[in-house]
Design a protein with these regions (language model features):
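Charged, gly/pro-rich active-site loop segments
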Residues: 1-12, 85-167
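Short, basic/aromatic recognition patches
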Residues: 2-28
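Amphipathic alpha-helical interface surfaces
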Residues: 17, 41, 62-65, 100, ...
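Short secondary-structure boundary/capping segments
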Residues: 18-19, 44, 64, 125-127
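Alpha-helix boundary recognition
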Residues: 21-22, 67-68, 109, 128
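Short beta-strand segments
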Residues: 24-58, 64-66, 72-77, 85-88
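A short beta-turn/loop motif at secondary-structure boundaries
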Residues: 35-37, 80-82, 125-129
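Short, surface-exposed beta-strand-loop junctions and turns on beta-sheet-rich folds
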Residues: 60-62, 81, 151-152
Length: 167
């Protein structure tokens, strides 16, 4: 899992990075379309030894974009009542295929799906039939972090200072 020495320096930013990268959150992956515009996709992810793994289908736009141009960025944030933490990095994507991709994808799915979900033919079966590659995002270090828990002295995270985000 998280290779802390590889990804960050100690302190509040490191703690935030560990919290967000090891949590069960959604990530936004940005890749570049052929015309130069940006394509964003919300994805499940798994941090592995400083990289971000994303299970997907080779037929998706994000996969086709990564095959043509490996430059990408990832944004992961938490959104709770009175709390916002996030991390972001730019980097590049390597596409993993075959048996290695199938094994990596199982680890990504198991972060988000229960054993029951993985065994259900309409859930686990469907996702296995669809996701045939893994996007291996290698961030350019360092990650950027932010959070209402500590930025600006934590003032934005104090009760009564801001409205709660809609669920």
């Amino acid at each position: 899992m998280l290779n802390q020495h590889k990804v960050f320096s100690a302190g509040v930013h490191g703690e935030r990075l560990v919290h967000v990268l090891s949590g069960r959150y959604l990530a936004t992956l940005a890749t570049r379309n052929g015309d130069g515009s940006i394509h964003q996709a919300v994805v499940w992810f798994l941090e592995s030894d400083g990289a971000i793994l994303i299970a997907t289908s080779a037929a998706t736009r994000k996969a086709q974009n990564a095959a043509r141009d490996p430059a990408a960025s990832v944004l992961i944030d938490t959104r709770g009542s009175g709390e916002l933490r996030g991390v972001a990095a730019s980097g590049s994507i390597e596409i993993v295929r075959g048996d290695e991709a199938r094994a990596l994808n199982e680890t990504v799915w198991s972060k988000y799906l229960t054993d029951q979900g993985l065994e259900d033919p309409e859930v686990g079966g469907a996702i296995r039939a669809n996701d045939d590659i893994t996007l291996h995002f290698c961030p350019d270090l360092p990650w950027r972090t932010w959070g209402t828990d500590s930025d600006f002295g934590g003032a934005f995270g104090r009760p009564g200072t801001s409205y709660a985000l809609d669920a």
